Amino acid sequence: MIDSRFPLIDLHRHLDGNIRPQTILELGQQYRLALPANELEALRPHVQISDSVPDLVSFLQKLDWGVAVLATLDACRRVAYENVEDLKRAGIDYAELRFSPYYMAQRHGLPLQGVVEAIIDGVSAASRDVGVPVKLIGIMSRTFGQEACRQELEALLSGRERIAALDLAGDELGFPGDLFRSHFTRARDAGWHITVHAGEAAGAESIWQAIRELGAERIGHGVNAIQDARLMDYLAEHAIGVEACLTSNLQTSTVPSLAQHPLKHFLQHGIIANLNTDDPAVEGIELRHEYQTAAPAAGLSAEQIRQAQYNGLSMAFLSPAEKQVLRDAKQMC
C-alpha cells in the first residue's frame, strides 16, 4: 500500500507521546523515581494502550508516565534523540515532531527555555547522525490555561529559528480556541506556520474557530468536520490539510470503529488529508501500520491510500525546494 517511489511522511507525531517504554523504565531507575512497575512487560500496560479508552483525556493520561521521568534536561535531550532514531527504524523519510515544553517541564519544574533548547539539540544531533530530516512544531498545552500557554509560547519563541510552526493541543472542550487568539497572532507575526488540534473532542465549530480565529493552515484530527458540509467544502476549496490519525482516533473512542472514520469521505471530497501516527509509543503502532492495516480497515481504496501518502508531502511545512529534495532522494534509491 505504500508507494516506495515517494517519500513516507509523518506530520502529526508527538515527540512527548513517543517515549519508549524501555526508556521510561531506565530513566525511572536512573533518577530513582517511583513507577507503577519495575519490569518492562509489567510497565507496558501503564504506558501503552491495549484497547480503546473512554475519551481523549483518558488517553492522555497514558502519556503522563513518559513525561514523569523527564527529571533533567539530559533526559529531554535523550528522548528527542531517540524519537529521530525511531523515525529511521520505521522507514520514515521526513517528519514534523511536535512537543509541549510546559507538559515536559511541569512534573520536575524544569526551565521551559531549557526544555526547548534540549529538544532542538537532541533532534538536530540525531537528524545529522541518522539522516532523517525533521522539522519541529511547538505545542501550547491548552489544558494548563492561558497564562501557562503564554509562558510556553515565550519559551518556544526563544528557539523560533529552529521551530517551523505552532500548535494548540490538550483539552479541546474545556479550553476552546478563542481563548488563545493573541497567542497565535504572535506566532504568525514570528513567521510560523499554524496547525491546530480541532474537531477531535469538540465539534465542527472548533475547526471553524481554528481557521478563522487562529489562522490554521492544517487541522489535527479534524474528525468532526464530517458534521458540516459547508466546512467540508471550505477545507477542500482552501487547501487546508487534515492530519488524520486513524488508530489514535479509534483508541480515544473519537470514532466507534475504523470503518466509521470519515477519512475516506474527506479524500472523496477533495480535502487534502494524510496518514499520521499521533503518539506511536503509547498506541503501540508505527506509520506502516496506518497504511497497511488501519487505512484498509477504514475503507480506503488502494488509490486513496496512495493519495494520502502524496498529500503528506504537499501538506508539509517545507519550501518547494525542500520538497523536491525529498522527491529526488526517493527516485535515486
Curated annotation (Swiss-Prot):
Residues of the active site: E200
Cite the binding residues for substrate. Answer: H14, D16, G170, D279
**Cofactor detail note:** Binds 1 zinc ion per subunit.
The record, for Gene3D superfamilies, names: Metal-dependent hydrolases
**Cofactor(s) recorded in Swiss-Prot or TrEMBL:** Zn(2+)
Q: Give any Gene Ontology cellular component.
A: cytosol
The UniProt site entry described as Important for catalytic activity is assigned to H221
GO:BP terms for this protein?
Answer: adenosine catabolic process; hypoxanthine salvage; inosine biosynthetic process; nucleotide metabolic process; purine ribonucleoside monophosphate biosynthetic process
Homology family = Belongs to the metallo-dependent hydrolases superfamily. Adenosine and AMP deaminases family. Adenosine deaminase subfamily.
Under which name does UniProt file this protein? Adenosine deaminase
The organism is Edwardsiella ictaluri (strain 93-146)
Q: Identify the gene encoding this protein.
A: add
